[in-house]
């Protein structure tokens, strides 16, 4: 549930602002419950488990791709919602595989619901206090990958062989290096002045490199612009 809220926050503020954009992630999330509790699942959680590493890698890389046309918007939505779907399918499948006998089902479903509440509370209440941007999204993507059955197996010990673990670690390190490089480049060029996060998302005031402008931006939407050189009476340029 935490990843559901984080994904919804990211796509509705940093990719596109559109009515009912919260619906596709919710549909994908609920669909995973329908699939894993079915007698004959349409998609095997094991298949989702095998694809999860690549889905998380694609989602992390998309975090630093600028949204400049409708094709990027559509691609971003597909990748982020797809990563949510595969992560939820893998982890929910692991829960169902550990479902106890009838005598323990009440406790099982109660704890599952409690986990959903705690995940939602972390994203909705705690993350806005801890982070000034939607940093919980990549953190929860990584957590979903590390908690997947492919990494943890049936117990808490890692069950990967050395070769698979090395390849996976190398891919994650490469993702981290590329992501960090893009983040540093953006930090050097975006001229960030103030970043604040509240109930309605992240608001940022910055000065683009090489331009005599100060911009106010919410998500990927620019809400105002002023010329910096007019110190006596800055002229509003846009809203």
Q: Which positions does each model-derived feature cover?
A:
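Alpha-helical transmembrane segments of multi-pass membrane proteins
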Residues: 1-239
